[in-house]
Amino acid sequence: MTLTDGRIVDRDEGNHQWEGHQINSGIDWDIWNQKDGFKDETHQLFKKPVVMDAFCSVVRVLDLDRVFVLGGNKNMDSTNPDTQTATMIYNVKDRKFELSTKLNDKRWYGSVVRTGDEKMIMMGGQDYVSSVNSIIPEILDLKNFNKGWSYLNKAKSEDLFGDTNNTLNEWHYPRAFLASDGNVVGISYNKIWVMDSRDD
């Protein structure tokens, strides 16, 4: 794979390529119009459209016009800012990137689920710099971004979003799904759980 600065990187080369190289950052965006095939002109490259490192973030399509990018990264090998609490909206129609409401906790390798009443819950992840796990999920009303993110304090769990015995990494991309009864069902490593939507 050839990077935008001309460097060539091999796929699946392991730790020797991970440690210390400069591509642990997701700061450039390539928007591809797949309807027009695989030609170079079907891609539009945006170099640093906003100050957000989206490496290890989560991306969700909100509607036909907006894509939501949540959580970010702090590349320890660069001078890039710490954007682990950042969120961003990509406007498909206008092809514009705009920073959105910040998360309360750092969510490197976090996960999200969208509820039936148009809310987004983010859970898991950690602060990459300090290795402090984000054990309290937080919620955003997608109909009212201005209210910002709120903690779901009753859902706080070291067991489900921490790192039991420093071996299981439950914080690492816990999987979550919206069940037919409106509750959130999740998997944290080898643990299955349910979040009651009727109780904050």
Question: Where are these predicted regions, by residue range?
Answer:
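Kelch-like beta-propeller repeat domains
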Residues: 1-200
